[in-house]
Swiss-Prot record:
It comes from Mus musculus. The lineage of its organism: Eukaryota, Metazoa, Chordata, Craniata, Vertebrata. Keywords: ANK repeat, Membrane, Repeat, Transmembrane, Transmembrane helix. The chain crosses the membrane at residues 195-215. ANK repeats lie at residues 11-40, 44-74, 77-103, 107-138. This is Ankyrin repeat domain-containing protein 46. It is found in: Membrane. It comes from the Eukaryota.
Length: 228
């Protein structure tokens, strides 16, 4: 069951709009090729895309879109062509060309709400519900991703500000990082136990040099004994 305004007449004095109402693809194409505006409106603000979509004429919808019809156009009540749809293929075409499934008209009604009011078939309702669910999930993923991006940017900005306020700290961190890398490479090349042995030899040499220079053995109490 497609959606048509109850008080509407099926007649109009605009040839292109009448062709869309009648589902006359050939005449619609001829008019568009002759220069008719694909976005021309009727007295309610509806374009040919609204009228063709309401009647499930997906071929004419595709034709209008090819000639530049605006899929986002709304009538004077804020309805897009999707608000008037009652056919699966027409809905799929409009959504694939940029129409949001959760868009509201001036009364706050979405295409799904209007479809339920009109009593369209269950396949259409299920499709609209599925598309709305996908839209919500996509929005949640997008919001989560944006939040993570903002948090990362704030963290990087804070680190950059800290580095600018403490330039010596940044330089010191660079030197420390370079030393750490060099030390790790040295240990890997020489081997842990050889490095340990080298450190022990250096320590013993240091003790020997200290004794040679001062004549005092380190760690030995050389205070003279008191004679009673």
């Amino acid at each position: 069951m497609s959606y048509v305004f109850v008080n509407d007449s099926s007649q109009t004095n605009v040839p292109l709009l009448q062709a869309c109402i009648d589902g006359d693809f050939t005449y619609s194409k001829r008019l568009l090729e002759s220069g008719f505006d694909p976005n021309i409106r009727d007295s309610r603000g509806r374009t040919g895309l609204h009228l063709a979509a309401a009647r499930g004429n997906v071929d004419i919808c595709q034709l209008l879109h090819k000639f530049g019809a605006d899929p986002l156009a709304t009538d004077y009540q804020g309805n897009t062509a999707l608000h008037l749809c009652g056919h699966v293929d027409t809905i799929q075409f409009l959504v694939s060309n940029g129409l949001k499934i959760d868009i509201c008209n001036h009364q706050g009604a979405t295409p799904l709400v209007l479809a339920k009011r009109r009593g369209v078939n269950k396949d259409v309702i299920r499709l609209l519900e599925s598309l709305e669910e996908q839209e919500v999930k996509g929005f949640n993923r997008g919001a989560h991703s944006k939040l993570e991006t903002m948090q990362t940017a704030e963290s990087e900005s804070a680190m950059e500000s800290h580095s600018l306020l403490n330039p010596n700290l940044q330089q010191g961190e660079g030197v420390l990082s370079s030393f750490r890398t060099t030390w790790q490479e040295f240990v890997e090349d020489l081997g842990f136990w050889r490095v340990l042995l080298l450190i022990l030899v250096i320590a013993l040499l240091s003790l020997g040099i200290a004794y040679y220079v001062s004549g005092v053995l380190p760690f030995v109490d050389n205070q003279p004994e008191l004679v009673h």
